[in-house]
């Protein structure tokens, strides 16, 4: 018999999953629609498509693990799931990093030659860095996952105790996240400095009146700030989710930590939708039509 708290956590997890499913689905459809309309992939559309696709996969992995985690305690399934999960998670982080670099390229305003050179070169240079680093990281992740995993012996149960070697295993698999996270923080910091500099100029010339560039700065920083907060929650909740599944498993703790984790791919999709005016207006129209239809057919 499920307790009230556990049932509430399951309900929250399902709601988050549905929100992310709709949000990421809307972003994928919008990206393809823009491609069909213009017959050309822009950098922004590719980033949004990759980000939404990775979040979509990450959501399903979390829900799959949450629903069937007892079956994944065997060495084979845990190993393969861990490798795929880490690759999808790191790909999602990389696309978010590219989004922050893209915002820097399009929005950042600096007059110094060094910053102008960095603005022109950093985006194209980071494309090659992403490709090379991601290929190396995929190979290392697969190699670590296939050779480092040593399941405990002498226990026929599917539940294995969480030992110290598994901390090192998880640490090595996630070691590829440090570089993109650093690039993300640097580019976000440059956006903050650019916003501060631009605000000082506008305050001196237009009595503090907000303009389109300042609004673009704030929209970008809101998106990046929400991503950073949700990603940190996801990273901090991951080890607790792993330890809560050890024998004997604590279902309440499992649902608490994985509900926090699923908020990362789900809620950030809404933040991205709110930052794209055309998608935001379309979603508002659809919601309004749904409300009107419900009122017409309701009692």
Curated annotation (Swiss-Prot):
InterPro entries: TAS2R. PANTHER family: TASTE RECEPTOR TYPE 2, TASTE RECEPTOR TYPE 2 MEMBER 5. GO terms for molecular function: bitter taste receptor activity; G protein-coupled receptor activity. Belongs to the G-protein coupled receptor T2R family. This is Taste receptor type 2 member 5. The gene is TAS2R5. Gene3D superfamilies: Rhodopsin 7-helix transmembrane proteins. The lineage of its organism: Eukaryota, Metazoa, Chordata, Craniata, Vertebrata. It comes from the Eukaryota.
